[in-house]
Amino acid sequence: MTERIGKIQTIKGLIEKDELGITHMHEHIFINYLDYFEKPNEQELKMCCLGGGSGSGNSNSNKTIEDLSNEKISLINNHWVQYNYNKNLHNLQLNEMEIAIRELEMFKRNGGSTIVEVTTKGIGRDPLQCLKVSQELNINIVMGAGYYLDKSISQFVQSMTEKQMEDEIVKQCLIGIDDTSIKAGIIGEVGCSFPLTNNEKKSLIASAKAQQRTGLSISIHPGRSQTAPLEIIQILKDSGADLSRVIIGHIDRTIHDINILLETAKTGCILEFDLFGMEISHYPFGGEVGMPSDNQRIEWIYQLIKHGYGENIVISHDIYTKHRLVSYGGHGYSHILFNIIPRMKKFGYSDTDINNILINNPKRLLTIIK
């Protein structure tokens, strides 16, 4: 165990922390999000049927709801999929090796070094496929341990005790994920609904206990309420978690009040703005607040830095659907590096601010401490 201390666990093995480089702390390379599919309705079908006009031969007015659900992303349905990304089955799976390599090669070409792949139990985690990507491109991939939302894990954990869940998380970190020898380098993303379910509370407590045994950070998927992060933080604190190594993800779709952001930051946890590039006027999964623009994200982070929380911030894209990949008309894994960092500099971010967000904070969080 002592050989792990001070190093970072990647999919290919332990690396020195200075090998990490520019890091996106919350991404998915392979994922199956079909549990969260919602069937389109008749009104949406009418909106998506593009008539070709008399004699054009291009009319798709006979399209059915099943067609709309199953058809591949194209120029014709691209906007509808962006607006209703949970209603197209093709969109809800990242499962194409060739495209994964192409997309992440672009990330590497733009200066990226490390992807934290936080797909966990219940949503199609695939360490062997991720290993192939890492080997092909020579980029670092850090895998996640633990359990996602109750909807995806109840079949696995309903009869498990907190201790059994804790032991399984530790096994994924110290021995290997599933039937592989590939070890996780972070706990999470740990799925939390709002309100929390009993299984999710067990998962949180198990994750806190596993952190004490592995020396890893915890990455949280909070429920969609501005009060959810503080409730989760309290449960983790009561269970012995090191809050300075707890990352509250999806902050940008969860808290839009600067005072609540500051209250959350005061706990010592890490605030993760991980939905850069997702700028939609309609957020299918709802919640108390909508989806902000990248400009809003940049402004909120800047305010947090000015309040002294520059070492408590990490960023990412959380790509988990095809429509956000460049191959399907989206922004891809390089959006932050190619578009956002220049905008941050124009906004007034210093080089130190940016290096902390992209390199130093991830390095500290991913370094194993026991």
Curated annotation (Swiss-Prot):
- Entry coiled-coil feature ranges: none
- Pfam family, any one: PTE
Needs which cofactor?
A: a divalent metal cation
Supply the Gene3D superfamilies for this chain.
Metal-dependent hydrolases
Provide the binding site for a divalent metal cation 1: H26, H28, E189, D318
Cellular localization per UniProt: Cytoplasm, Cytosol
Matching SUPFAM superfamilies: Metallo-dependent hydrolases (SSF51556)
Q: Tell me the Gene Ontology biological-process terms attached to this UniProt entry.
A: catabolic process
Q: Which GO terms describe its cellular component?
A: cytosol
Identify the EC number(s). 3.1.-.-
Q: Which parts of the sequence bind a divalent metal cation 2?
A: E189, H221, H250
User: Carries keyword Hydrolase?
Assistant: yes
List the keywords (alphabetical): Cytoplasm, Hydrolase, Metal-binding
Q: Which reaction does it catalyse?
A: N-acetyltaurine + H2O = taurine + acetate
GO molecular function list: N-acetyltaurine hydrolase activity; zinc ion binding
**PANTHER family found in the cross-reference section:** PHOSPHOTRIESTERASE-RELATED (PTHR10819), PHOSPHOTRIESTERASE-RELATED PROTEIN (PTHR10819:SF3)
The UniProt similarity line reads:
Belongs to the metallo-dependent hydrolases superfamily. Phosphotriesterase family.
What is the protein name given in its UniProt record? N-acetyltaurine hydrolase
Tell me what organism the protein belongs to: Dictyostelium discoideum (Social amoeba)
> What gene, per UniProt, encodes this protein?
pter
